[in-house]
Amino acid sequence: ADGRVTSVKSVCGDKEEIFDGDIFFSSMPVKDLVAGMGSAVPAAPAEIAAGLPYRDFVTVGLLVDKLDLKNETGIKTLNNIVPDCWIYVQDVGVKLGRIQIFNNWSPYLVKDPQHTVWVGLEYFCNEGDDFWSMDEKACVDKAVSELISMGVINKNTKILDSHRERVQKAYPAYFDTYDRMDELVKYLDTFENLYCVGRNGQHRYNNMDHSMATSFEAVSNILSGKKTKENIWGVNTEAEYHEEAADEKKA
């Protein structure tokens, strides 16, 4: 009402609750936020929001006794495992997109980092496709098979534990109606007490640091009375941050 959000409705199963408030933060997918506003949304922003695309994500966690990858760097690691946190997979013969080694983020993430390694195997897919819908055992078996085929582990490696996790809308994508995102932002900013933050809240492929920074900027605006939200939407739009720009600068 009058350019302000006055309440939100929470629906969980058969239970509905109304929450009144003075200030509202939204980190939900902006596509779903606008859809939830109903028929009051003008046609243009509704169309833009409905057309925003996403890439979904499945990660398979495996606890193994060791990796066959050798640490051939000068970087010292606990138990001399490879020092990478992430390894991007370019092998067209497998579906796996990225390997994450949790021991290298922090050994405290692993119960016994001296004798075991937790790896996360990341698969990019679409919600509802064959890989997304695969049962957990088949998914884990495929992940193990692909690691063996790449020589990351071998058929005698002990798989001590496993877990499959699906993540909806993990990657906001920059095609379809995204080229009209500025129009949608302009509409959302007509609600002076609504702050869209985070990766999905802004439909921006930000890392965790920048996603959190959008919230810091929002709180700063609220405390200072600043009305414009350009600084919130502008987090991580500086071209020099991005890897490709850094590479160009080196060249």
Model-assigned labels for residue ranges:
Residues 1-152, 230-240, 249-251:
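Mid-domain catalytic core of redox enzymes
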Residues 126, 169-170, 201-203:
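Short Gly/Pro-enriched loop/turn and capping motifs at secondary-structure junctions
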Residues 132, 170-173:
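Short, glycine/charged-rich beta-strand-loop motifs at protein surfaces that mediate ligand recognition
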Residues 154-160:
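Flexible, glycine/charged-enriched surface loops at secondary-structure junctions
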